[in-house]
Amino acid sequence: MCPWCRRRWQAWAVRVDTGAGENVVARLGSLRQHQRNGQRSPHKPLLVLLALGRLAAIGSSQLPWSVAESVLAELIAEFGPPSRTGRAQSAAYPFTRLRADGVWVLDRDVAMDLAGPLARSHVTGQLEPSVESALLAQPALIGAAARELVMSNFPETVAPDVLDAVGLDPREVFAAGDLLAWPGGALTGRKRDPGWRLRVLEAWDRQCAFCGYDGQFAGASVAIEAAHVRWFAFGGPDSADNGLALCSLHHKLFDLGMLELNTSLTVVVSARFSARTLAGRAIYDLHGRELSPRPGTARPAVSHISWHTRQVFKGEPLAA
């Protein structure tokens, strides 16, 4: 974040115009996305987050297609669902379609969805002027909007990586979100069950369901987390059949689509995962390992496993 934006962010964080701010955050947080039946479609949110990162860094959200073609495409490939669409094409979809949401403008009138005209006409996009002006006037809104977008499209394990990738400091984003809790936003919608985490850890004997790690310090589990199979942001319930106890590493890899469960409750490693060191290559040894929950533990529901396979797992399974 540029020094000017940082100073403005800090100055406005505690005296923001909640009426105007709520409107801007609501506009950026209510993008039209194809999410029928739990389908993930983070393309537009990733473009807005990238624009917010540029606005925080240089004071302008202007994004030439020559930059978006590679940077946005890389974000979609890393954080989006599995797709066979070419990278440039995957970036062209949100770059042109976001105009219909009223928060994005292009400096050339080009057809929807086509990458060719964007390149030939050297098109540049940016946030709609009234949106950009409001964000520059109250930079704390950048963090509030970013938090709304990232938390409604990604789990907590992945959200900081997304923010880092677009040039936003996760600590500042989440601090801004704490100060600015917009009524009706995604973050104030469904309420999480505060007892779910403990029930999941206990059901799996406080050990990683994939590798068996069960470290403790002073009697408390260390780096053992409750993972949603179907993400909470996409209708995943806080229920026993949607939870796994996983170590921090395997939770992260599971949410990034490098690890998967099949319906036989066997661990699957993506062929796109690679490692050279002995420690890294230990991930390969998880492939084909069967889960062995203690008697009475609810197994992950097939419907939740199938969602994760369709919407999160990347690439093909590792060869046996």
Locations of the language-model features?
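Short cysteine-rich clusters marking metal-coordination/redox-active sites
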Residues: 2, 208-211, 247
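Mixed-charge, low-complexity interaction segments
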Residues: 2-181, 191, 264-270, 276-278, ...
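A detector for short metal-coordination/catalytic motifs
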Residues: 13-14, 191, 216-320
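Short, well-structured alpha-helical interface segments that form or flank functional binding sites
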Residues: 42-50, 191, 195, 199, ...
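Short, charged surface segments at domain edges that flank catalytic/cofactor-binding sites
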Residues: 149-150, 157-216, 229-241
